[in-house]
């Protein structure tokens, strides 16, 4: 049991790193981290604005690197402190250890240690106060109670991990990889009051959690076109569009409701609580008939002297039809029971529409910019800039994340011929604390 728990924790950590990097690719690039998440180069903007494939690079700005390689100082430190060979006895992963802190473990998953934490956000302790009477139960989680989400909590969005293609005179033909993932849950009112507000447990009452998760992935043959329709390189109007034929390789969705119901007495009787759960799963596994759908990207960009403005929208009308889906139901109440509901049925899913509005101002070796980005799970705002002085680049930025919290980024880099070394710092409060931590990111860029 201990070995499997530790192994699952390490696997979750690795998946967390991959998910973070995939969902927000800038997390592996110290340049964008130093800008607070702002993407100033055309390579970053092309992801969300099809018109930018025709927009020339800004004068005086470094070109886009051919390859960015993160330097994972955080993982090196993490596995030095938590050797895999001793994972089953490590207090961080061994739930039987007196030093085990599940809040700290979850915090590690929410902030995968790809890079080095130079200031860790304080993690609430295990201190919990129980009030137990003859027929009453009350739990005071102390500082940890602030971490209990009051509203629906979730992560996810859409990403394009691969997008190779060939361009000829504004026409581009390629194959795009796509992934859509969503995970969310919400505490029932009774359980929320019990955990967050220390409301005493009541008899004959159900305490539950609602959950929902979606994962689908595939590829999309793409035809795109971008060109300047007015002006010249210094003052011009650019438009672009892309048509995708989405091919779905696999799809899964789970919706569930789990909890327990108290009896006539909190502690008396043979069954003081009765656990129960129900779930509905839909899936089209790899090897079934492919999903299919059509969607489009649209973009426009305006360049007028030192000012650049763009608006891009992705996955417009992208509805995926899965022709061979199976639906199962599962129920637990005293014992588990599952049964097929339907098979070989058609299911439709919809990719979230993402958009980016960006503004940049370049004068000499100074570039300032801002953007508003929504990739399917809330809106983020980035403002930042960089100053180039010879081989040195200085960067800084500020962001408002999806939870409307303000974060900061700063950093710099050195460029020697075709090789660049960058370092970036950013604050984060997505850990299980109301105070900020600071992470240092490092990466190599090959131009």
Predicted regions and their residues:
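A broad, structure-centric signal for solvent-exposed, well-ordered loop/edge residues
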Residues: 7-8, 42, 54, 320-323
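Outer-membrane beta-barrel porins/channels
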Residues: 24-30, 167-447
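N-terminal, post-signal peptide beta-strand-biased segments of exported outer-membrane/organellar beta-barrel
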Residues: 20-173, 178, 447
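Bacterial N-terminal signal peptides that target proteins for export
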Residues: 1-9
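Bacterial N-terminal signal peptides
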Residues: 8-17
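Short hydrophobic "helix-edge" motifs at membrane interfaces and signal-peptide entry regions
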Residues: 8, 38-40, 304-306
